[in-house]
Design a protein with these regions (language model features):
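N-terminal secretory signal peptides that target proteins for export/translocation
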Residues: 1-15
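Bacterial N-terminal signal peptides
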Residues: 16-34
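Alpha-helix N-cap/loop-to-helix initiation residues
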Residues: 59, 95-96, 126
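Alpha-helical cap/lid subdomain in secreted, periplasmic
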Residues: 2-5, 82, 100-231
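Serine-esterase "nucleophile elbow" of acetyl-processing enzymes
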Residues: 38-92, 102-111
Length: 231
């Protein structure tokens, strides 16, 4: 359940920005304080391991278990007869700092062949320094590659609540890091959702988290790049 602070923040956001911009903040508010709950790890027998490290956009926040984009990924792998297994280590509320602190143990435990990094939204929600977000994502990418994994960065975009320069620089972090670290990239995780003709229909009642019907589109945004990393 959201805290009173979070509810007030959402209400204030709706008054301060256009409806579409508020929906584009989904990537940020998706990991609101008080929504900490790691999803169970799912792993089929055999094949490479795909480790997903994300926030509530990947942790099925507000969704029935098994309906999020990560469980849909497992079904996609099965339908294409890919033997890869999926470990979802996403936590609602996580930041790049939290992900960076958790990653070494996850790499040691699961020894993934592919690491999907879906973090950064909460950093922008809090207006954290962009250089810190960049350092954390770069360090996570480097650590995963050093452990022998291929990395997929999942990019986000935000409305200019902290100024257009901040929003542009934040969006630019993901391609910048991907290029520097030679990692794969999903340019915008919520493409076709936050920028849809009727974005309200793509979100849960809170108008923050993508609904069950949007999960397939989220997977569709990730799958083309992820598929290239699978052997």
């Amino acid at each position: 359940m959201k805290s009173d602070f979070t509810k007030l923040a959402v209400q204030a956001l709706a008054r301060l920005v256009k409806p579409l911009a508020a929906l584009q903040m989904a990537a940020l508010l998706a990991a609101a304080p008080g929504a900490w709950a790691q999803t169970p790890a799912h792993a089929a027998q055999g094949g490479d391991t795909i480790l997903v490290v994300g926030d509530s956009l990947s942790a099925e926040y507000g969704l029935k278990r098994g309906t999020g984009w990560v469980p849909l990924l497992e079904k996609q792998l099965a339908s294409e007869k890919k033997s890869a297994k999926v470990v979802n280590a996403s936590i609602s509320g996580d930041t790049t700092s939290g992900g960076r602190s958790r990653l070494p143990a996850l790499l040691a435990q699961h020894k993934p062949a592919v690491v999907v990094l879906e973090l950064g939204g909460n950093d922008a929600l809090r207006g954290l320094p962009l250089d810190m977000t960049e350092q954390n994502l770069s360090a996570m990418t480097q650590a995963a590659k050093k452990a022998g994994a291929r990395v997929l960065l999942v990019g986000m975009q935000v409305p200019p609540n902290y100024g257009s320069a901040y929003a542009a620089s934040f969006a630019g972090l993901f391609p910048k890091i991907a290029k520097a670290e030679k990692a794969a990239l999903v340019p915008f995780f919520l493409k076709g959702i936050a920028d849809a003709a009727d974005p309200v229909a793509a979100f849960q009642a809170d108008r923050i988290h993508p609904n069950e019907q949007s999960q397939a589109r989220m997977l569709a945004n990730v799958w083309p790049e992820l598929k290239k990393l699978l052997k």
